[in-house]
């Protein structure tokens, strides 16, 4: 050992003379900490320099004897074990310490243990800790003698703890790390060593740690070292290498070296090293590396890991960039090993590493996203493709070419410096000139072409083949229906063979897009030219011969040559499609994915190191996708494409006989069937994508069910006996009984575990005392005299009688669910647990921002807001009646005991029963009678444990601590015997073990800025759970004026001393480079706290989850899933391992777990959200994890901490882009070779949103986040490199779900367009008498009719498809419920959903998903939306619901509904009823799911609010107004101006950057134009007088009608606005002096006129159409679409940016432009505002009419008696007896409400009457008018009015060309000629 230590001691110049040690013996322990705080002037904090005044932690200047230069060795130079005073051995590094050290408690020498052991009267067996009731002096807490026993207890440990400390201190001095960071990382490292060495020898523990962090095959550092070819840099230097291609000479040498490598004997290291001298291949480099690593001494290994941890611990944002950190570490290591460092005498100043190395990179990262304006950070208006993000920065270090780009200020390249000098010059690097984009996240749909190219090939090519085969009329010469003549065979083959050309074209486009996304200057960019030319050749091969076939001869000539060529080309096309479907784009025709070359090894290592599937998993993956596509292709062909065959044949060959349009005659109307056919095919094409997803869901569900039976999870598994065998299973699966001596009876051990579970449920008030008695094991006298025996509860046996529900639990209770799942889960295969002593240490990490910690009394017993009808406590009592009953009984017992203790029992006896009932009222009402804090606190806790609070999460996950103590005690009975009756000593021992193995870390970034009540709650948490660790951000003012404040990451727990200012003194306080919150918040919050995690694994938990004792007992098995517990004692650096063998090593990175959504059964929406989460998190995760498609979804996944933290952390953090931050960590793990598993037997609780709005906020966040994911490089790597089966799994499990929603909405819109055109076609045509069973060559009657019936029947097919696609979404929920809870529960839940209209909600949610995705990909602006945590009992005002959902769903629903109305009236079909239901959902869902929407009074008060919402905000700013909503909607497109004037209205504005014009044209204008064109064509056709005998003079001018009705309202509005603007400018300021409402009056006039004008032109259209309702409808629809198009163009192309304040709007109406803070823009703004107001007036009219229509449609419901009660039952699933009472108002309030209701009720019915009049009036008039209105007009306006009473039947004898023989005999055909 000494030889190893020698060089190290040479480096440290720490004298260990006796004088230095003796001088401190009295007052200080061996590490220089004051032993008796009374003797020390203050606790030494390295952050406070001597002489500076005490900082906010209230420190005195450090003691004189302390303030010595640490290089003299007086700080830690004492010999070990010197501090004998306390018999304790503490280090200032450890988390424990004597009083006065940061790891100690503030309560002096004793503190109350956070959890007491089970079994004692005060024991805590529950998630609710016990407060009070015991004397804190009773338990004297002797702190553990050794904080890291597994390492220090073993005499074999290769390095002593003192030597490790010396290493950390030495590194800190030499490289300038912070003192607190060093202490933190030392503790971190020791906990890691302790955790490992508890299950292996210390030597192996250190070796395996070094292998994981630095040198092993799975270590990221080693992978990077070889990927970036740093072995070459170390050998010959990058500056001496020509980076890039190998020369011919080098290639020859490479072959020779490879041969030498194969011949070498790996056992003889020396000989092999000599042989491979000069060989730069990966195998040789790997051999050299292993040999080098194998020779390291333990001290050097410690030094390597310590240096990495110290770098990582202070890297703050750089932790997200794993390889950048590796580079910094490499530079530091080179410097450390060099003589330059050894010879340096004075230490580096503290903080040098942070300030010199990390902060410049931090500033670069921050400046990419933010700029400083007036001293505050403002987000730059850059989209992702202009921001050099974390990934771009990181990828610079992947390739030597990138590292070569690093330049210093003086222009020198870093690689030109010697290795040892690089670290010292890192501060001089000009990072701004170094980093660049390595992947452009351009906001475009083209990413989908590249990333998912194989999906398009599989669908578009096959659809082409199916379609071409079934459309013979397109390539048949002179097709005649009566003959049904067939095309040439060659043409049939050739047109199908074009599918191969389509596939090649897709690949070419994908490659071109890739060219634009991956900048060529990045060394990792693939060389695409070769692939591009190859693709062009394949394209030519596929297309050339087909051109030959079609051009070779006329379509009347049969040619054998053409036939043969066409047939061969068909098979070539099939081969092309199969090849392109299977081959990833990344591997096409290039060496990019080949392992043989070192050129792209970095991209393979970091973006394509997928863990392969093996054995059954691989075959299962293949089977899933073969089944899906076999089913899909056959079903699509027979159901979708064959049904098109007849419509294609008819529509493609029919020409219409119509008069046409005044301006262009019959050009358009003749081809109407072909236009309809195009629309039908387009709609069917979208459906072709949809049904793949449908089959994926079905097959996935089937496989998942199969697996659940196989695992024995299902309740339907016949052999289950889950309760009878439960005790045996607890013994075999929960307890680690293998190493245990047999002398203890299993029953004794099982009983302790079982009783603890039952008692914990009793303490959580889930079980009443009588239930508990039946469920516990009891001690009863034995038959043997004097002995006692255990009696098992009858529960285990009587389960089979099926009467257990009533006897043992409350029916359908939480206790029943938990015990059932526990029993069920133990019947599945579970990894064997290790003894507690040997289990690894792990941490639970929870980020917290502003979520509720603990509910306040006010929140519980006061109504939420004016719209709520119930207090939270009332609602919770209704949801959990049994638990409330138990709680009240418990409280009463407590109150009686307290009363008895105070001596009042005599009075109690005298009270009669009635009085006691009255006395109990307060208990049952609010849970307490006395307002003493201990009673109110109990009620607060009871409510908090049933809401989504942080307290619930912490109390739930602190059960790990209880579980560990319980298991340790049960499995080690000798410990209990050893302590005898000393309960305190036993508890201390158990505490020690729990603290060693489990940590709970909450990242409360805002703690330092908490309000008093939040601080009080946080302090309450720390007192209840002293072992809870809280990391927070601490801020200090800057040292010099004008600089940024200093920000620290600090850590406290419940043992930290409380200072005078009420705050706690932190254990660790590490300075950061600046504010760490640069992204969307959550990932940065996790990252800053990550340095405080301990152990080998982290469980990531959100602040609204829960856990249970019985689940925590399984923790050892869950951790065993990482496959690292039974490590064989192998040397990872053994020289025999070949490079090829090690590439197969893929560690488990993430273990996912199930979630139980505890908000289910609290109403329909909560239950839908819960069902969705269950199927996604359980049913699908089960199959996905097996076939390698599961990613990481945040909670409640366990992660392999070393694997993830060395690869960029637990989430990604670029603002906007990484919106769903968790999933990126999963993709990152998958790309870098980690495996992701799913654990079936363990589940946590999770809260979900319960309100309509909050659920859809979450939906919006997920949808927008998916839009951002589509742009991300992870999708690019996965999509272009995964093997086909894994790619399909990934696609359909993640983006496919969202694109499927998008396709559903797209197909719905396409269908509406098709329906409008098809209905107008059917409306105007005389249909044939159609019989599908007759041959198609029969003569159609009447002669000259149009046989459109098959096309009309297609609507039925389409409806059925959409219907199935929709209902299939419910299959997984039902199946999941079926297998987990049985048939009855599944049926019950399904019918509850149906009766509660949950399908309506599903349709709406699907629209929100697709709308969020669409708008994100077009406009951007995705932001983090915090999801709701409360209960949805408030009635939300109509105006808020309307403004929230109008843009995303209601407008689209209303437009489609008008089109559907036209379709229904023009040509009625029963299947259209389904669309009426769907579209009603889009319009009415927000109001149907609004609590108390139909309460009479509330409805009309809400109407009042709506009217006021429409009219306010024009005189002065109002937070909630129509104009505000319109401006915000518009700003998403136009963006905001930067100029601020400090007005209140600016606060609400937020950030919105201007959308890219190209995107707006693609996403807003073009679809709008297509829609307008589609409606316009249908409108002109329905007016084209089909079949009417006319002359050219009779052509109608329907186009002019559209022009008039579209533009006239806009022109009138413009006139009104000019008038108002003139009025306001001239007289507004004058009026303003006396009238306060000038603006409102002006706006009111303009808005009123706009509404009247739009309604008037609706009637005008009716008149122009000669009062024909059908034609008027399509006319109005067309006008609306045309106006939309005009307004979109105006907004996108004419409007400048919006002001953040509201001044321009108010100035327009009041005329006060001056003094509004607009500066010179006051001159240009009026014209901009005028343009905006033109659009606004039409929008106002639309919102006024649409809002009223929605309100009027609710009238039939409002007038139903007791509707509110039925509606509440539907929403909340509360029985009528448990209904929420109506609110109670004072008399004055009641009178006021009644008056308002009368007033607005009258207004409502008045508007209703006017609307009715507008419809009834023209309808009545139409019956009175018989002659053509426009007869008297001539010229252009001659046929402005549609002629009436014309006959359009020109069939049979009415035909103009009728001859008796025509169409009654078969015409003769041309004869064929044949060429040989």
Swiss-Prot record:
Compartments where found: Mitochondrion; Cell membrane
Q: What is the effect of changing residue 605 to I?
A: In 1093; temperature-sensitive mutant; higher beta-glucan content of cells
- Coiled-coil positions are none
Compositional bias, Polar residues, is annotated for 1-25, 60-71
Q: Which residues form the signal peptide?
A: none
InterPro entries reported for this sequence = FKS1-like_dom1, FKS1-like_dom2, Glyco_trans_48_dom
- Annotated source species: Saccharomyces cerevisiae (strain ATCC 204508 / S288c)
Give the EC class as a word.
transferase
Q: Tell me the residue ranges located in the Extracellular compartment per UniProt.
A: 476-492, 553-563, 643-678, 1380-1444, 1491-1560, 1623-1643, 1696-1802
**Per its record, how is this protein called by name?**
1,3-beta-glucan synthase component FKS1
């Amino acid at each position: 050992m000494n030889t190893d230590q020698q060089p190290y001691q040479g480096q440290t110049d720490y004298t260990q003379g006796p004088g230095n040690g003796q001088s401190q013996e009295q007052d200080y322990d061996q590490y220089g900490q004051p032993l008796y705080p009374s003797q020390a002037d203050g606790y030494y904090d390295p952050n406070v320099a001597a002489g500076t005044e005490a900082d906010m932690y209230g420190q005195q200047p450090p003691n004189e004897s302390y303030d010595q230069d640490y290089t003299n060795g007086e700080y830690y130079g004492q010999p070990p074990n010197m501090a004998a005073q306390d018999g304790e051995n503490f280090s200032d590094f450890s988390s424990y310490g004597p009083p006065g050290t940061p790891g100690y408690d503030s309560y002096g020498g004793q503190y109350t243990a956070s959890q007491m052991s089970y079994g004692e009267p005060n024991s805590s067996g529950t998630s609710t800790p016990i407060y009070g009731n015991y004397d804190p002096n009773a338990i004297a807490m002797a702190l553990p003698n050794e904080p890291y026993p597994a390492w220090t207890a073993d005499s074999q440990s290769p390095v002593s703890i003192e030597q490790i400390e010396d290493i950390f201190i030495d590194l800190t001095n030499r490289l300038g790390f912070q003192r607190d960071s060093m202490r933190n990382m030392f503790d971190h490292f020791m906990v890691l060593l302790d955790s490992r060495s508890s299950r292996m020898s210390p030597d192996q523990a250190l070796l395996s740690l070094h292998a994981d962090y630095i040198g092993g095959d799975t270590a990221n550092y080693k992978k990077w070292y070889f990927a970036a070819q740093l072995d070459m840099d170390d050998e010959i230097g990058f500056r001496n290498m020509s980076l890039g291609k190998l020369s011919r000479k080098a290639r020859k040498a490479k072959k020779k070296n490879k041969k030498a490598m194969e011949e070498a004997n790996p056992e003889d290291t020396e000989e092999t090293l000599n042989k491979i001298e000069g060989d730069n291949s990966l195998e040789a480099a790997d051999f050299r590396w292993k040999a080098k690593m194998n020779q390291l001494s333990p001290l050097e290994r410690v030094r390597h890991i310590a240096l990495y941890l110290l770098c990582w611990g202070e890297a703050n944002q750089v932790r997200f960039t794993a390889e950048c950190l590796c580079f910094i570490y490499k530079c530091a290591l080179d410097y450390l090993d060099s003589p330059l460092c050894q010879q340096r005498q004075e230490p580096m100043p503290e903080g040098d590493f942070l300030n010199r190395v990390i902060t410049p990179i931090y500033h670069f990262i921050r400046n990419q996203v933010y700029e400083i304006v007036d001293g505050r950070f403002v987000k730059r208006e850059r989209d992702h493709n202009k921001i050099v993000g974390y990934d771009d920065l990181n990828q610079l270090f992947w390739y030597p070419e990138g590292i070569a780009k690093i330049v210093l200020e003086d222009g020198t390249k870093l690689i030109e410096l010697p290795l040892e000098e690089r670290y010292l010059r890192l501060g001089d690097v000009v990072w701004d000139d170094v980093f660049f984009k390595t992947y452009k996240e351009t906001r475009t749909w083209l990413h989908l072409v590249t990333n998912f190219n194989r999906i398009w090939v599989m669908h578009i090519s096959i659809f082409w083949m199916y379609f071409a085969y079934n459309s013979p009329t397109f390539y048949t010469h002179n097709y005649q229906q009566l003959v049904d003549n067939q095309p040439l065979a060659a043409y049939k083959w050739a047109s199908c063979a074009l599918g191969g050309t389509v596939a090649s074209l897709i690949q070419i486009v994908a490659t071109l897009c890739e060219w634009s996304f991956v900048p060529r200057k990045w060394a990792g960019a693939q060389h695409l030219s070769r692939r591009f030319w190859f693709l062009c050749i394949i394209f030519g091969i596929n297309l050339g011969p087909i051109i030959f076939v079609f051009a070779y001869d006329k379509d009347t000539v049969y040619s054998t040559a053409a036939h043969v060529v066409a047939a061969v080309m068909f098979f070539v096309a099939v081969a092309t499609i199969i090849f392109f479907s299977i081959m990833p784009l990344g591997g096409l025709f290039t060496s990019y994915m080949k392992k043989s070359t070192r050129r792209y090894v970095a991209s393979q290592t970091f973006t394509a190191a997928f863990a392969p599937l093996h054995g059954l998993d691989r075959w299962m993956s293949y089977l899933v996708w073969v089944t899906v596509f076999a089913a899909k292709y056959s079903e699509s062909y027979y159901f979708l494409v064959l049904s098109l065959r007849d419509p294609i044949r008819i529509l493609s060959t029919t020409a219409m006989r119509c008069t046409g349009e005044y301006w262009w005659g019959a050009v358009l109307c003749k081809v109407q069937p072909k236009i309809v056919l195009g629309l039908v095919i387009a709609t069917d094409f979208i459906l072709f994508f949809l049904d793949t997803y449908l089959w994926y869901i079905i097959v996935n569900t089937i496989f998942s069910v199969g697996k659940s039976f196989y695992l024995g999870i299902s309740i339907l598994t016949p052999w289950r006996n889950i309760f009878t065998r439960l005790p045996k299973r607890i013994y075999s699966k929960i307890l680690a009984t293998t190493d245990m001596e047999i002398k203890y009876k299993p029953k004794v051990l099982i009983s302790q575990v079982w009783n603890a579970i039952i008692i914990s449920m009793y303490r959580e008030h889930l079980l009443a005392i009588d239930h508990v008695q039946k469920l516990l094991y009891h001690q009863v006298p034995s038959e043997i005299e004097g002995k006692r025996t255990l009696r098992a509860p009858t529960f285990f046996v009587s389960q089979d009688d099926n009467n257990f529900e009533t006897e043992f639990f409350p029916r359908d209770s939480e206790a029943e669910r938990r015990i059932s799942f526990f029993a069920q889960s133990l019947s599945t295969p579970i990894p064997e647990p290790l003894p507690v002593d040997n289990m690894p240490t792990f941490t639970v990490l929870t980020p917290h921002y502003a979520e509720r910690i603990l509910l306040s009394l006010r929140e519980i017993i006061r109504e939420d807001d004016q719209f709520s009808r119930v207090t939270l406590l009332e609602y919770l009592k209704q949801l959990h009646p049994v638990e409330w009953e138990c709680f009240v009984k418990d409280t009463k017992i407590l109150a009686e005991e307290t009363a008895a203790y105070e001596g009042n029992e005599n009075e109690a006896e005298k009270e009669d029963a009635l009085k006691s009932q009255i006395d109990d009222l307060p208990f049952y009402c609010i849970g307490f009678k006395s307002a003493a804090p201990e009673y109110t606190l109990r009620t607060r806790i009871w409510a908090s444990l049933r809401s989504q609070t942080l307290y619930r999460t912490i109390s739930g996950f602190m059960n790990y601590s209880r579980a560990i103590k319980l298991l340790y005690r049960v499995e080690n009975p000798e410990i209990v015997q050893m302590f005898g009756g000393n309960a305190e000593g036993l508890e201390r021992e158990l505490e020690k073990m729990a603290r060693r193995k489990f940590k709970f870390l909450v990242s409360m970034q805002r703690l330092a800025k908490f309000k008093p009540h939040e601080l009080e709650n946080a302090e309450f948490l720390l007192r209840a759970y002293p072992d809870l660790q809280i990391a927070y951000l601490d801020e200090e003012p800057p040292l010099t004026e004008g600089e940024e404040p200093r920000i620290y990451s600090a850590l406290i727990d419940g043992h930290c001393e409380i200072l005078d200012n009420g705050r706690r003194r932190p254990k660790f306080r590490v300075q950061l480079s600046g504010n760490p919150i640069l992204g969307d918040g959550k990932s940065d919050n996790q990252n800053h706290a990550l340095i405080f995690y301990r152990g080998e694994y982290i469980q990531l938990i959100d602040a609204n989850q829960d856990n249970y004792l019985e689940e925590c007992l399984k923790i050892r098995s869950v951790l065993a899933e990482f496959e690292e517990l039974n490590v064989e004692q192998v040397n990872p650096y053994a020289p025999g391992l070949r490079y090829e063998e090690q590439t197969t090593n893929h560690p488990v990175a993430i273990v996912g777990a199930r979630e139980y959504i505890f908000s289910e059964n609290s109403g329909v929406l909560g239950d839908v959200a819960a069902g969705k989460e269950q199927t996604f998190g359980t049913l699908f995760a089960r199959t996905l994890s097996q076939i390698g498609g599961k990613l990481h979804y945040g909670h409640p996944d366990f992660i392999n901490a070393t694997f993830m933290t060395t690869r960029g952390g637990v989430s990604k953090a670029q603002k906007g882009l990484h919106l769903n931050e968790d999933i990126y960590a999963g993709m990152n793990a998958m790309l870098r070779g980690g495996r992701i598993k799913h654990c079936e037997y363990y589940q946590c609780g999770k809260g979900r949103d319960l309100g309509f709005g909050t659920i859809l906020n979450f939906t919006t966040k997920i949808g927008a986040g998916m839009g951002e994911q589509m742009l991300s490089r992870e999708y690019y790597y996965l999509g272009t490199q995964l093997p086909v089966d894994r790619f399909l799994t990934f696609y359909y499990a993640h983006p496919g779900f969202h694109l499927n929603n998008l396709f559903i909405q797209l197909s719905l819109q396409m269908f509406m367009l098709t329906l409008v055109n098809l209905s107008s076609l059917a409306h105007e045509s005389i249909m044939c008498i159609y019989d599908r069973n007759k041959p198609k060559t029969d003569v159609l009657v009447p002669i000259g009719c149009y046989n459109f019936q098959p096309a009309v029947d297609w609507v039925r097919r389409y409806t059925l498809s959409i219907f199935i696609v929709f209902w299939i979404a419910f299959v997984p929920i039902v199946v999941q419920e079926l297998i987990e809870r049985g048939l009855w529960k599944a049926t019950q839940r399904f019918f509850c959903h149906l009766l509660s209209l949950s399908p309506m909600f599903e349709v709406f949610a699907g629209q929100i998903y697709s709308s969020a995705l669409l708008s994100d990909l077009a406009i951007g602006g995705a932001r983090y939306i915090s999801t709701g945590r409360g209960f949805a009992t408030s009635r939300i005002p109509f105006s808020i619901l309307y403004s929230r959902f109008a843009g995303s769903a209601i407008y689209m629903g209303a437009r489609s509904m008008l089109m559907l109305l036209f379709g229904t009236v023009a040509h009625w079909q029963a299947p259209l009823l389904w669309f009426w239901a769907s579209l009603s959902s889009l319009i009415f869902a927000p109001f149907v799911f609004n609590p108390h929407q139909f309460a009479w009074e509330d409805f009309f008060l809400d109407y009042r609010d709506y009217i006021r919402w429409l009219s306010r905000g024009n005189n002065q700013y109002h937070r909630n107004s129509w104009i505000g909503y319109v401006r915000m909607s518009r700003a998403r497109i136009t963006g905001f101006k930067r100029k601020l004037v400090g007005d209140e209205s600016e606060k609400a504005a937020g950030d919105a950057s201007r959308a890219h014009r190209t995107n707006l044209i693609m996403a807003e204008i073009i679809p709008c134009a297509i829609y307008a064109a589609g409606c316009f064509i249908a409108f002109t056709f329905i007016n084209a007088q089909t079949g009417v005998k006319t002359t050219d003079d009779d052509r109608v001018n329907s186009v002019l009608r559209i022009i008039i009705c579209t533009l006239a309202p806009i022109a009138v509005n413009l006139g009104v606005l000019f008038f108002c603007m003139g009025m306001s400018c001239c007289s507004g300021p004058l009026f303003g002096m006396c009238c306060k409402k000038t603006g409102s009056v002006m706006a009111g006039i303009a808005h009123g006129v706009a509404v009247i004008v739009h309604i008037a032109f609706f009637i005008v259209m009716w008149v122009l159409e000669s009062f024909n309702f059908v034609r008027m409808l399509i006319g109005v629809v067309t006008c609306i679409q045309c106006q939309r198009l005009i307004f979109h163009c105006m907004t996108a192309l004419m409007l400048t940016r919006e002001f953040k304040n509201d001044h321009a709007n108010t100035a327009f109406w009041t005329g006060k432009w001056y003094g509004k803070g607009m500066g010179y823009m006051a001159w240009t703004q009026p014209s901009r505002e005028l343009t905006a107001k033109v659009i606004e007036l039409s929008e106002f009219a639309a919102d006024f009419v649409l809002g009223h229509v929605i309100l009027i449609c609710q009238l039939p419901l409002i007038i139903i008696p007791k509707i509110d009660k039925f509606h509440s039952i539907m929403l909340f699933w509360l029985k009528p007896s448990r209904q929420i009472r109506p609110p109670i108002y004072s008399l004055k309030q009641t009178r006021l409400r009644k008056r308002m209701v009368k007033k607005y009720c009258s207004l409502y019915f008045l508007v209703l009457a006017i609307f009715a009049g507008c419809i009834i009036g023209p309808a009545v008039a139409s019956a009175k008018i018989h002659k053509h209105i426009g007869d008297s007009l001539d010229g252009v306006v001659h046929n402005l009015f549609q002629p009436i009473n014309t006959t359009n039947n020109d069939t049979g004898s009415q035909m103009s060309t009728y001859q008796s023989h025509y169409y009654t005999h078969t015409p003769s055909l041309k004869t064929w000629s044949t060429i040989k």
